[in-house]
Amino acid sequence: MPIQEALESLRSGKPVLVFDSKDREGETDIVFASQFITPNAIRLMRKDGGGLICVTMPSKVADILGLDYLIKIYERSRMPFVKRLYPNDIPYGEQSSFSITINHRKTFTGIPDADRALTISKFAEIVEHALSSNSEYKKAQVVSEFGRNFRTPGHVFTLIASKGLISRRKGHTELTTYLAYLAGLIPSTTIVEMLGDDGKSLSKSKAIEYAKKRGFVFLEGKDIIKKFLSEPLPNI
């Protein structure tokens, strides 16, 4: 079963490819479990993917850390440009999952492979600590840890998965965060869109061809959604 093969790949620190839907973005993302990100993984993502390297988090973690969707942060700023640039015309009809950008404080510029790998792997630890915090005191400790170790703006884009995951939104953020949950890993993935040499997103057929050539699992969003409907996760 492709789902099980994908979970094994994620547990082993290997990437999987996820195509959302022809009726949505129609894009394939390279996906790693954030806890296993290495400089080599970042190199593969930027060279074979080419899109924007982002790290996901469950909405519960965002709530604990006091993070919000970037558009909500802009709205609260009440700066005039926000109204003029409001994203009310996204072609695939969904709110963006983007939140703030971050760098780990031990990075230099934050952009080299090693810097981004450090930022992402350490952020995965924050996600784990936040989800295991079972008191207000422990939550406050995680918030303090986040502030001590990270700064913004940075070179890693964070994404907040919708509450209820796929039941609310069917983007790569939700699809892949759910896969990490299923794999029993820290529920944070690192994702990047695959781009072609024609100035467009890499076609599905070429993404499948790439997966076969590299021995990577290729998953379709519809298969992940089907799994979610039969095995939803509580309290997410």
Please place each PLM-identified region on the residue numbering.
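Catalytic domains of riboflavin
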Residues: 1-236
